[in-house]
From Swiss-Prot:
Keywords: Acetylation, Membrane, Phosphoprotein, Vacuole. It comes from Saccharomyces cerevisiae (strain ATCC 204508 / S288c) (Baker's yeast). This is vacuole-related protein 17. The lineage of its organism: Eukaryota, Fungi, Dikarya, Ascomycota, Saccharomycotina. GO terms for molecular function: protein-membrane adaptor activity. Signal peptide: none annotated. It comes from the Eukaryota. Residues 109-134, 150-211 are annotated as: Disordered. Coiled coil: none annotated.
Length: 423
């Protein structure tokens, strides 16, 4: 589009320039005619000639430039036409070659169909049989190829001539009268199992080397497996016995005067220690210490709003009298019934303390009794009168009844009555 517009513009310029030149020529001719008819001054004629020459030069330059532009445009147009013609010609040539190739392929495809249907056996002659060559076997062909073109290059062997021994005059063996030197015997190196065995002395032995040396010295590793153990002895919990602790507190020895303890049974996994009620101590004998050294007050323990004040007076009943075979132990129901039968109640304040305090008081009282006994044994010789008073006070403390107020709920008492205590 741009080239066509340029061509149109150049053609118009040429036409206009030619028209201007023609108009100037006509105007000059008119002026000449008029000048002939009318007399004019020489100066005016000179001016007119200068203007004429100027206009003519401008018109000539414009004409020349327009012609050059026209020539360039024409050349480009011709070249473009030539290139387009060449491209079209190339495309036509390619199409013709493609058509020729397709025709030849079609001819080749139709050749076997036009062949006669006679079998090759009927057409075979002596010349055809003579020209037949059997195909060689693959093994023979492969062997021939290997011989012609070996896969591996031949090994290059380099031979060295033996070095003659040079006689050295500094040695005695080199003298002409001395015997010849015998050749040294060839020594072979011992084949090592590893490339680094015993060669690198500066290398530190690794941990694997120490393990190997450890097992090499012993030649084997014996392991014992416990798969043949008989686990039937450990199936029942009845046979498992927990012996009493050696370091028993001193207050436990009071109950040892009666019958012997039964061995404790270990609980099974499905049982719970918390399901059983904690068994109280067998006896509440608090007279093992002197009344002058420590006299406990009335401890109270509050559990709930609906508490019942129970006055605990430990007394020896007829059921606790020793029998012929041994000391007789009262049952839990008899003990609890004796606790409930007491009607002396006192109102006390609620105190949320644990029952562990009672066991702590028992241990504390027993420790005080042992301290008082040791104190009496040391100072028995000096103060005999004081020792007799302490013994009398001790007897009085045994005869005196220790009152302990324990506040428990009715539900706990009923549960305790229903549970059987094992001593």
């Amino acid at each position: 589009m741009a080239t066509q517009a340029l061509e149109d513009i150049t053609e118009r310029l040429l036409i206009r320039s030619q028209e201007a030149i023609l108009q100037l020529d006509l105007w000059i001719q008119r002026q000449q005619r008029s000048s002939i008819c009318q007399t004019t001054d020489q100066e005016s004629l000179d001016k007119l000639s200068q203007q004429y020459n100027q206009y003519m030069s401008q018109l000539n330059s414009l004409y020349v430039r327009s012609e050059s532009v026209r020539d360039k445009l024409s050349k480009e147009q011709q070249r473009r036409l030539i290139t387009e013609d060449n491209e079209h010609q190339r495309i036509e040539d390619l199409v013709r070659e493609f058509q020729d190739i397709t025709l030849r392929l079609n001819e080749l495809a139709t050749v076997p169909n036009e062949a006669p249907n006679d079998s090759p056996q009927s057409q075979s002659t002596r010349s055809s049989l003579g020209s037949f060559q059997p195909r060689p076997l693959k093994i023979i062909e492969r062997q021939r190829l290997c011989m012609v073109t070996p896969s591996k290059p031949p090994k290059k062997s380099v031979g060295f001539n033996p070095i003659n021994e040079v006689d050295c005059p500094s040695k005695t063996n080199s003298l002409p009268c001395s015997p010849k030197k015998q050749p040294a015997r060839n020594r072979t190196l011992r084949a090592a199992k590893s490339h680094d065995t015993g060669l690198n002395k500066s290398k530190k032995p690794s941990s694997s080397d120490t393990y190997e040396s450890f097992f090499k010295n012993r030649q084997r590793l014996s392991l014992t497996f416990f798969d043949e153990m008989d686990d039937e002895d450990f199936d029942s919990d009845q046979d498992t016995i927990i012996l009493p602790n050696i370091s028993t507190p001193p207050h436990v020895g009071v109950t040892a005067k009666g019958a012997e303890f039964e061995p404790l049974r270990r609980y099974n996994s499905h049982e719970s220690i918390l399901s059983n009620k904690p068994a109280p101590s067998k006896s509440l004998n608090l007279g093992s210490f002197s009344a002058s050294f420590f006299r406990p007050s009335n401890p109270t323990f509050g559990t709930s709003i609906s508490n019942v004040q129970v006055n605990c007076h430990p007394t020896v009943a007829a059921t606790m009298a020793p029998s012929r075979n041994g000391p007789r132990i009262s049952s839990s129901k008899a003990l609890l019934s004796s606790f409930i039968a007491r009607s002396d109640t006192h109102t006390v304040k609620e105190n949320n303390t644990n029952l562990k305090h009672a066991s702590f008081m028992d241990k504390f009282n027993s420790s005080l009794s042992t301290i008082s006994e040791s104190f009496q044994s040391k100072r028995g010789r000096k103060n005999k009168g004081m020792n007799e008073e302490r013994i009398s006070n001790h007897n009085v403390a045994q005869e005196q009844k220790n009152n302990m107020d324990i506040s428990v709920s009715i539900e706990e008492l009923q549960d305790a009555l229903n549970t059987e205590l094992l001593f």
